[in-house]
Structures are given as C-alpha cells and as structure tokens.
Amino acid sequence: MGVPLTPIIKRKVISLSDLRGRTLAVDANNVLYQFLALIRKPDGSPLTDSEGRVTSHLVGLLFRTTRLMSEYGTRLAFVFDGKPPRLKRAELEKRREVRAKALAQWKEAKASGDYATAFSKAVASSKLSLQMSEDAKRLLSLLGVPQIQAPSDAEAQAALMVARGDAWAVASQDYDSLLYGAPRLVRYVTLTGREFLPSKGESKRLLRELIDLQSVLDGLNLSRESLVDLALLVGTDFNDGVLGVGPKTALKFMRQYGSIEAIPSNVLPRPPGDLDSLRKAFLDPEVVRDYRLEFGDMDEEGVVSFLCKEREFSPQRVDEAVKRLKSVRARRSALTKWMDSSGQKPRPFR
C-alpha cells in the first residue's frame, strides 16, 4: 500500500517521451499487482489459460513493457521483493484479510450478475502467487530484461540503484522509495487510461508523475530523516501511525518540532512504535550491493514457446511484440556501429 503522502508531495506531470532513453528500476511486485488488478474480464475474472493458470500479469509485461522499450527506448530493470521485513508482517496479514473478504464479495456479485461490483471487488482481491512471480521472471529473462532479486523490500533496492546512478528513477506507484532515499520516482509508467480505486469504488484518470526527492525536501523544508518521521506519524507498511494524524498535520509537527521525540507528550502521548527500528527500516534497509544490471538478447523462440505453446497466447499478438523488440535491438546495434565508426560517445541511459 505504501505511505499516503499525496497531499503534501510536489509532483510534476510528465509524458512517456520524457523517459526516452532512461533506465528505470521497476518495483516489480507493485507493477505486477497492477496488471493482475486491471487486466481482467468484465466480470472481474483474471485472464487464464485452459488449465486455469493466470496470465493477466504476463499480458501486461509483454505488451506494455515492450511498448515502452520500442517506442521510447526506455530501459527497464525489474526489482523483485525478497523476504518481507519483520516489521511488515502485521500489514501483510491485514492485506490477506482484505483480499479474502473482497474475494468472497466478488464471487457473490458475479453470481448475481452485478458485474460492476464484481469487477471492483475482484481488483481488491488480486494476489500475486509464487508461480506468477516465477512466470514473470521467466518471461523477462526470455525478453532479455534484467531482474534483480532484493533481499527484502524491492523499493529499497531500487532506491539504491538510482542513488548509485545505475538507474535514473524508481518506477512505482508508492512513495516509499523516497523514504529509502531514491533521488527520483516516476509513477504510473506502465499503466494507461484510468486507475480503479477499490476503497472508493471509483476510478481516476492516470497522469504520469515525476517526483524529485530534493525538490520535495526543499519544498517542505525538511531533511530526509524528518520526512521519515513524518511518514511514521501518518503510518507506513511498518507501523499504524497516530490516530487522527494525516500528512498535513504531521508536516506541521515536523516543521514545529523537528523530530517525533521533540513533540510534547500532551500533543503526542506515545510514539508510533519502536522509533529506532522503524527509522532503521527506511534509513538503513537491507539491500544487496553486488547486483548485476545486464541487458541481454531476446530469446525469440523461447518467448514464442512459453507464451504461445505453454500459456496459449495469440501467436499474432506475440509476434507483434517480438517484432517491436527486435526493432529496438536493430536500432541500438546500428547506433552503436555508427558511434564506434565516428568516435562518438553514446548518451548514458541513466
């Protein structure tokens, strides 16, 4: 879910052309959940093959990522979640309960023919299984798209990659990567049209956004440490926050007092959890530093075999996606040869 900072975060609306030639560290689980939530039949049922294996996420990966790569030259590196942090277990249990309730409501609405309600409940019931995740990794490998396995939270790993200059921005809908220190965050990169909000039962138009961490900190007159404290007051995936304290109130507290400890006890009777552990989760997260970011060649036969023979995709549509990626490889190869012959240096993708 991520920390709800929208009311106080300065965002810049961008277009996909603004990401031309950039390398993005993609929060894989976040993106796959969105594909699973939105790529569905009118009654809310996910796309599946004849054996009942879900393919919605593979559809999203194949067609939306290849479009970004072919039309805009954007390089994508997918970062997958590892073992959930201990502090996140309570939040994950809440999510399981919400999904279970939504699943029951979806089945009831679908049985009654109320497809509008069924779709909304189906979105909230989305679950990314281990098999789905492994299928996604397999497809990405066949496409030559790199994956990095984070030891814990993918957004922390992606933030490190951007901070080190190996990627230009983190791609995720959540703001957590800012708390982890990502210099830049882009939202809604892989989605088009409208986003459905299950909690409100409505949808909103998707506008791609760029958030610059330093601009956010300067605009709020906060340090990154104070921004983390602000988030802890509001509530994160690691803690519940303080009842009645939203982003604007938390910002007021941080500007006035500077830290949670400095807030008077008559204003804040008790802190929102173990502050040392919570701060460490964001300021010193578990990451791997010896990752490899390598963009490989596409295994065309492997892509066709996996998607068409095993998962029963339309050969025509798969062929279209494959041709798009082949055109990207051809253009890059031609550019590299020209650069080599002319002594020019290519622009860094990050």
Question: What does each model-identified segment do?
Answer:
Residues G2-I14, D18-R164, L191:
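Noncatalytic, basic helical substrate-engagement surface that gates or grips nucleic-acid strands
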Residues V3, I9, V13-R20, G201-R350:
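Non-catalytic nucleic-acid-binding/docking modules located in mid-to-C-terminal regions
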Residues V13, T23, D43, E91, ...:
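Solvent-exposed, flexible loop/coil residues
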Residues D27, F78, D174, G246, ...:
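Residue-level signature of catalytic and energy-coupling elements of molecular machines
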Residues Y33-F35, F80, W106, Y175, ...:
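Aromatic side chains
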Residues S45-P46, S125-L275:
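Nuclease catalytic cores that cleave nucleic-acid phosphodiester bonds
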Residues P85-L87, E93, A111-T117, K121-S126, ...:
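Short, structured coil/loop segments at alpha-helix boundaries
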